[in-house]
Amino acid sequence: MTVSLHARRVARFPLFRATRAAVLSALVAAGAAHAAVLTPEQTTDLYLGTFVNGDVAKAAQFNDAMRPRFDGKDALDVAAIPTLGDTMRDNMIAALLSKMPAKSRAALRAPISASIASYQHVLARSECRATGSTQKPNEYVEGESIATVDFSCRVVDVEPGVKALKEKLGNPRLKTDKARTAFLAAFFSGMAHVYDEAPMGRPVTGQVDLYGTNEKGWLTGSPGDVLSPLVDALLGPIGSAGGEADK
């Protein structure tokens, strides 16, 4: 099954919405950069390598290409890339725990942390590349264009593992905080194993809009856009746990 950007899943599952927002918000400070003379596809490949795979070399390559446009300064904070994963993890854990009853949070911290760590590991293994782009005039900036770049990725396929996990846990009616806590602890612990054991191969597609010209180069102020379809594919099951637990 090919996955593309879809907002309906976000609207359905409040836990997924909170977790997804935590992932993308962590990218704003690190990636609110401007760009120079690369093609739209080359620019996107470097964004993908930097923000999906955490590749510091890609960030440095991006800066080398952009430096002439920025008076010799770096466009991306390369020093922040190695710690970006820690920031994301902390934000995601905090977002998930904030949705839990206060008395359950201590018991859920460890299984939630384990599932997020496994998620980050498989995210970094994703294989992505730009596949093409189209351009149109930017009606808000005279003389500039918007390049919509298509990209494709291969990610781990978590759906079979999630299906098996849900069958194992069943569909209990969770009428007390204790029951809900036990269910969620089992689910998040199970999700860590699902991520660890999931095979690579699920296709995912997405798009990102870049702004600029072929002469000046291209940039985005929203590097999290390259992560959106991968987040949907890999974190959607965590959101579905919220739906089950709310029953």
Language model features with spans:
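Prokaryotic Sec-type signal peptides and long signal-anchor helices
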Residues: 17-20, 187
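Surface-exposed, charged secondary-structure patches
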Residues: 88-176
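N-terminal secretory signal peptides that target proteins for export/translocation
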Residues: 1-17
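Low-complexity, intrinsically disordered terminal/linker segments enriched in charged
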Residues: 161-247
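Sec/Tat signal peptide C-region and signal peptidase I cleavage site
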Residues: 31-35
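Bacterial N-terminal signal peptides
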Residues: 19-30
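A short, highly charged, low-complexity intrinsically disordered segment
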Residues: 12, 142, 243-247
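Core segments of small alpha/beta cavity-forming domains
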Residues: 36-114
